[in-house]
Amino acid sequence: MPYTKYICPDGHEVGIDECLTACRLEGQVNPNTGELYCPAGRCLSKRTLIALADQREWTGTPSTTQLLAGTRENYLKITKEYAIDPKSSLFMLHGTKVHDYLEKYTDDEGISEVRLDDGTSTGAFDYYSAENGGTLYDNKTYGSWKVAKILGLYTKRVPTGEVYKTGAKKGQPKYRNEIRSGGPRHRLDLAIQLNDYRMKIEKELKKPVNNLVCEVIVRDGNTYIATQ
């Protein structure tokens, strides 16, 4: 079953239809802060809440991305009603918008957003290019921390060669964090997803795939935290 409720800013759950009819927290004050829960009358615009409520219905055949989650998690999502925090789910709209925008610029020899069924699962790949012997592209929107883990980047404390001259740490060496490469690359989910799309394209479309590429938009790029 799809999610049927939203989690309000005060932690209570409300049916999506009820939420869209009227915000239950309009004009209500948070007793912990003394401020309105929803200064704009809603936690998010009605348009955004409607967009978040749009979900793909369960057809009986799993999708590639669905199978990346655990079996128990998928079973519960299919058989039980549940609630989501709409503000924490806004990333879904961002990813959908990026895919829809890029699809408009698919070249004549390229193929994009085609859902394939190989008899085991369905999967809609982002973009296939005939260049370089066949290249499959997948577009992602990630935070900088996840990107660093995928690329095998990590921080290491190294001495600066200086010491603290005053304070509680006087005489102790100073350190700074340096970003290093060569760490473990946590990208198993990407490998599973793209290779499943590759096998579907080779089987169903009879096209070669010799390269797998993930194009990532970093949500918090060009921010201080992304450099840390």
Where are these regions (language model features)?
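Conserved acidic
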Residues: K206
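Surface-exposed cleft-lining segments at the edges of enzyme active sites
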Residues: R176-R187
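Metal-dependent nuclease catalytic cores that hydrolyze phosphodiester bonds in DNA/RNA
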Residues: M1-L136, T141-K174, E202, I217-Q228
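Acidic carboxylate-rich catalytic motifs and surrounding loops in phosphoryl-/glycosyl-chemistry enzymes
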Residues: V209-R219
